[in-house]
């Protein structure tokens, strides 16, 4: 369909149809019950399927390469044998695997075809000082007027046409001035950024656009005849093209957001207006690789293609790869005979023409275009970001690997048409801007999708807190609110709980029997057609139930979602093998390619989307754990919610890292040479560093407590600051905002202070927002300078080149975007001297070739800002980053202002750069380093948290097996200790919520237990360290303790006692060291006449024991400096929740923990119904 790229006649009857039946199994991934949908994401929150999706995409691409190669081979063989290519028969033939040689030959034919289009000529030149000719097209001599039989007027009547021959110096083919341009271009780091060069033939002085790019063996020069001999066209033409693009881009940017269709409709209108083609379309690739025309602008008498769908093979994978390398592809005349490229026999393979603007279309594609009535075409790639970044890829001919081909803008013309390179260059800029705008719209849609996923996760947790599993269908919200469906059902313990439009109970039992027989080895199934999935009773269900998603919870419990019949009308470009189709299917005819017929899909529902299946999968995982724990006799689902949803343990381990970050940041803020201040939630100052005090004349003591809005800023900044505060307190952080601060005391006479600030939300350790911090940069000096510049006050050149450090980096542009000023500060910042850049194009040469940018999108954004400024539209604080001469990455804010004569006529633009100070950059770098380190730790902990569950299940299972064997008394005691330790660890993993411990809402699971078993479990957990450190363990535990029973949360008590004891073991002196355990029971009589058991624990060691900072951390509620201290602090709080308390006591010769724990007696607890 996209005629500029089609390289095979491929037409797949089944490989890419959106209406194809979709049903997928859910295959078991681990013994723990984790599952993932084949081909989809299996993550609990909708985000776990990225890797699977990428793998599936690669798999599809590989499969399509194979099919492309097979059909290409059939087409080539038919041409060689003189037989016509039987289009229909080739499609119907059973697919046979293509050999590696066949695929390699196919790719070589596409990328190294050895022919070009005749509207220009191609040279390949050695990339060295010799400029040796490695290859040339057969028409080179004719186009350059170098053939001996040519009689063309020449500036030099004695000139003799130099021969076009392999090994000759390519510079001799062109005028001396053109040769100099080529030499300069060959020396450039990124040669493609200089395109097009304006060069002339040596003999006739005929002008050409020279489009250069590097390949593996040298430099390819595509020469396209130009239409005028104006020597200024080299610059003026490029600038005019940019202006055309910027004008269209400005109209795109003015469109309202949130409407991708309007954006696409506008693009096709602009492109048709720019290029004059008969038809312009936006062609979008769907996830299954098939294409759809989503927007169209055409001549009135042409047949519309809007809404047509085309198979994935219509745009072969090889062509898609070419579009990623060369974003714009023009075919001037599909009937024109291709021109052969003659190359040096020493070259080991045909010349690579991937980046050539003249590369000839494949014969099959030319036939395809002719059959459909399209003689000329222009196809442009629409590239969007798929995540990630690429700091080094800046060539216009290539793109970062993190980018993906979203679709194409396709232009068709019914007669030969060739548009000049500068206009194609403008279209390329427009496509880059379209991709950026489209990317923002898609990101917005993605954010809305993420919000929906978060709402779904909340819904899952709410469901899990229900008292009974049946609550998910009997209460509101129910499982029908989870995904879009017409009905849902739960089959639980042999009972059927339906909601909405569902099968009858007899039918559901029949479906379960079918699932068990045909899909018993899976953990679920999703299909948009039960009939196509093979269910024999589908006809009896009728249109009411067509699609179904099912999740297996246990071998006998199921969750179902149902969708009713939806008739889908699919217009498909290229008729499928329809029995009534009498058209000639043996050739690539427009009837078989473009006259779409209506296909009504019956007995099929809307497909189940990946996000919907992720939500179903999450509920399946949680309910499976819930049902399993219910079977084991544990409590309701709340513990599972804490274990699955809240990763509180990550907070515990991460606080140590964050504390060090906080200490370092406080030091940096206090000593920073940039203004930094902070406010609380009421907008009152609670932070004011030395630099802002110096600038404003207001000391730290005087500033504390003052209102930022009412006391410290000018009235014109009030609205801005109020908005900043409001957004930051909600978590929305704004950057690069200018505010105007008042001055006080001696500084007051100097006038206001202008500061560019970033607003950062300040959070406490529980992640609650408690204020706002402003990190600023004083731009008062730059502000004064810019005002003088804009108003042409004084001698601006004296200001530009003043070495005063207050003068910011400044450069200027003339009306043609050529650099006209480059001050001392710019020389120091970039490493490029004024003489090296003045007179060069700022877009492409200065920024692009000298100062490298991150990629083509960055170049496009800079071009838009510069042209807007020249046109009278100023830009402030535009983020602008580049690499200096030494490769150092520079981040700045660009302000561009119109440069005008006294009469108001615009003659260019002044550009100012604002650079963060080294101290602030260092602070941010330290912060980024620590945040990266913390994030890495968090990922490690998340991995450990998830993976520790499987071995725990193994230990539990092994213990259960041992319990069923004949054991001796001591062996049974060992088993009881092992089981107690395993259950303690399981509880820590499940109930990892620090917040519930902090606010006292932790649910204690109380029951009767043996204190002797607790002490055995506690001691067992420290024995290895005791032995490793060669410490003596002294046990002072009365026999009555060993036999005593108590009532409480056994495993939390174990956790607390073990942590305190282990701390003594860690810090006991190694030489002649010992650790003592002393336990004393007491009976406490209460005022209500009841008795409680009072247990006194003492864990002691000789010497000082714990370091002071750990003891301090243990009794702190918010500030911690050690990991051990955090653990002890948490245990102290758990102990307090259980009614106990702890003291740490240092005596002259020993140190010890003194722990008091009061517990009810089991009999009295039972009589009171304590829970």
UniProtKB/Swiss-Prot annotation:
UniProt keyword Repeat present: yes
Alphabetical keyword list: Chromophore, Photoreceptor protein, Receptor, Repeat, Sensory transduction, Transcription, Transcription regulation
CDD domains: HATPase_Phy-like, HisKA, PAS
Record-level Gene Ontology MF annotations: phosphorelay sensor kinase activity; photoreceptor activity; protein homodimerization activity
Low complexity composition-biased segments: 1-19
Gene Ontology terms describing biological process: detection of visible light; red, far-red light phototransduction; regulation of DNA-templated transcription
Post-translational modification remark: Contains one covalently linked phytochromobilin chromophore.
GO cellular component terms given for this protein: nucleus
All copies of domain Histidine kinase, residue ranges: 943-1161
Signal peptide: none
Region (Disordered): 1-53
InterPro entries hit by this protein: GAF (IPR003018), GAF-like_dom_sf (IPR029016), HATPase_C_sf (IPR036890), His_kinase_dom (IPR005467), HisK_dim/P_dom (IPR003661), HisK_dim/P_sf (IPR036097), PAS (IPR000014), PAS-like_dom_sf (IPR035965)
Skewed-composition ranges (Gly residues): 38-52
Pfam hit, one: GAF
Binding site for phytochromobilin: 364
Keyword match Transcription: yes
Assembly with partners or alone: Homodimer.
Task of the protein: Regulatory photoreceptor which exists in two forms that are reversibly interconvertible by light: the Pr form that absorbs maximally in the red region of the spectrum and the Pfr form that absorbs maximally in the far-red region. Photoconversion of Pr to Pfr induces an array of morphogenic responses, whereas reconversion of Pfr to Pr cancels the induction of those responses. Pfr controls the expression of a number of nuclear genes including those encoding the small subunit of ribulose-bisphosphate carboxylase, chlorophyll A/B binding protein, protochlorophyllide reductase, rRNA, etc.
Family: Belongs to the phytochrome family.
Protein's name according to its UniProt entry: Phytochrome B
Gene responsible for this protein: PHYB
